[in-house]
Curated annotation (Swiss-Prot):
Compartment(s): Cell membrane; Nucleus; Cytoplasm; Golgi apparatus
Cited PANTHER family: ZINC TRANSPORTER ZIP11 (PTHR11040:SF211), ZINC/IRON TRANSPORTER (PTHR11040)
Keyword NADP annotated: no
One GO cellular component term noted in the UniProt record for this chain: membrane
Source organism per UniProt: Homo sapiens (Human)
Family: Belongs to the ZIP transporter (TC 2.A.5) family.
An example Gene Ontology molecular-function term: zinc ion transmembrane transporter activity
Ion transport among keywords: yes
GO BP terms, alphabetized: zinc ion import across plasma membrane; zinc ion transmembrane transport
Membrane topology reported for the UniProt record: Multi-pass membrane protein
Substrates-to-products reaction catalysed: Zn(2+)(in) = Zn(2+)(out); Cu(2+)(in) = Cu(2+)(out)
Protein name per its UniProtKB record: Zinc transporter ZIP11
Highest taxon, organism lineage: Eukaryota
Length: 342
């Protein structure tokens, strides 16, 4: 991120940095084993705190200032921010609802069943990748946002998420994964898994890239929308992408993927961010009136992801207190970064 260049170029540099941090986090799969849940849960908690702080200081605060200073909304200056924030959350929610209709529910091999430290998980040899049997106490891994999509723990008791239930998987003892038509053929199954994998990754990593792009596109539009603010946002998202890369690659390694393949899919989760960042910067440069909506949209998407995905995932293995304090630490670090360097 070099001051003095165009907003679009800055957004490209910023999102390349966030992608690189994702890859660096995914590379830890070469160091840690899949059973080290405390590290993963603490990292996810830290990422949640960073995202919440970045959502306010780098996105919502400039959006509110723009809506207020424009004078066009008067006492209703909150309206564009509220609309954008709600639309951002709705975007991620609807994307999650759409996934089963795009075929994710038809091919259970896109959802990897994991049971850390358990012998209940059985693997079936497959030249294209591991086909798994679903154990009774499973952790369903969604590739993309924070890796895990699972039975959550609430006060120590497991409960089934609606998203996991949407796949139609019954509770009970391990049963073989059924094959459907041409999915039994290795070639077709492999391409289908890859296509759905890329789709899931794209949907769930757009908000971060969009936030960085919109942040750089908004530079000098208000007093709080500065280069330093946009740079700090990119650094903050890069920091929280580090554990996210690990959260994708580590479960994949535990599911039977090779270390290099787990690393590849882990870093792939950040590859879409440069595209989303450039799009966000272009959009706000060409259409300045949408800036408050765009900033709030990115914030809403990020906050929804934290509440719906990252925080619940950090609570599933009995490390809830660790994850909570890590969240506080992440929030303080990002707040200090934004205020101290802004």
């Amino acid at each position: 991120m070099l001051q003095g260049h165009s907003s679009v170029f800055q957004a490209l540099l910023g999102t390349f940095f966030t992608w690189g941090m994702t890859a660096a986090g995914a590379a830890l799969v070469f160091v840690f084993s899949s059973g080290q849940r405390r590290i993963l849960d603490g990292s996810l908690g830290f990422a949640a705190g960073v995202m919440l702080a970045a959502s306010y200081w780098s996105l919502l605060a400039p959006a509110v200032e723009m809506a207020t200073s424009s004078g066009g909304f008067g006492a209703f200056a909150f309206f564009p921010v509220a609309v954008g924030f709600t639309l951002g959350a709705a975007f991620v929610y609807l994307a999650d609802l759409l996934m089963p209709h795009l075929g994710a529910a038809e091919d259970p091999q896109t959802t990897l069943a994991l049971n850390f430290g358990s012998t209940l998980m059985k693997k079936k040899s497959d030249p294209e990748g591991p086909a798994l049997l679903f154990p009774e106490s499973e952790l369903s891994i969604r590739i993309g946002r924070a890796g895990l999509l699972s039975d959550k723990s609430e006060n120590g008791e497991a409960y089934q998420r609606k998203k996991a239930a949407a796949t139609g998987l019954p509770e009970g003892p391990a049963v073989p994964v059924p094959s459907r038509g041409n999915l039994a053929q290795p070639g077709g199954s492999s391409w289908r898994r890859i296509a759905l994998l890329i789709l899931a990754i794209t949907i769930h990593n757009v908000p971060e890239g969009l936030a960085v792009g919109v942040g750089f596109g908004a530079i000098e539009k208000t007093a709080s929308a500065t280069f330093e603010s946009a740079r700090n946002l990119a650094i903050g998202i890069g920091i929280q992408n580090f554990p996210e890369g690990l959260a994708v690659s580590l479960p994949l390694r535990g599911a039977g993927f090779s270390t290099w393949r787990a690393f590849w899919y882990g870093q792939l989760s950040g590859m879409v961010e440069p595209l989303a960042g450039v799009f966000g910067a272009f959009a706000v440069v060409l259409a300045e009136p949408i800036l408050p909506y765009a900033l709030a949209f990115a914030a809403g998407a990020m906050v929804y992801v934290v509440m719906d995905d990252i925080i619940p995932e950090a609570q599933i293995s009995g490390n809830g207190k660790l994850a909570s304090w890590a969240s506080i630490l992440g929030f303080v670090v990002m707040m200090s970064l934004d205020v101290g360097l802004g």
